[in-house]
Amino acid sequence: HCLSVFIANGFFMNADEQEFSGLVKRHKGTIYSVCLMFADNQDEANDLMQEVLVRLWKGFGTFQGKGDEKGWVWRVAMNTCITQDAKKKHFTKVPVEENLLTSDTEDSKQMRMLHDRIHRLEPFDRAIVLLWLEDLSYEEIGQIVGISAKNVSVRLVRIKEQLKKFNG
């Protein structure tokens, strides 16, 4: 028990591991939000989260403070989830019985419906919506996904129209 407390508090980590641990602590909520948007259930979101963390660790040595940390984390998370989503589409999808939101309140039903509609978007559009829901500016979204702020604005208008057309 004591050993796990020492490890959890970073006593046996080298400087890179401590720095990476701090990065994960600062951005774990954001990373998990991205994973949830691409997952069919919480177990899948946790698996995606692990994959994102592995990719962040592999790229951490080359990143380490060079550029915008938040943008880098977003890009790695988005790219990982989009790649995994594309791989998943090669397999037959089994209907999901476990829902991310299990409460039956009206708000949770609306949230579930919104999540389902967003989940039906193409991965790139889903990424744009997720970033927009996180209150990032069009400029920040554009930098992360690699398009202009004007293009972000146009795409969001089209995405909102598409979401309205989806049947619940």
Task: Report the location of each language-model feature.
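Sigma70-family region 2
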Residues: N14, D40, E51-D68, K87-K88
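Hydrophobic positions on the alpha-helical face of helix-turn-helix-like DNA-binding modules
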Residues: V52, V76, I128-V129, I141-G142, ...
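Short amphipathic alpha helix immediately N-terminal
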Residues: R120-E140, I144
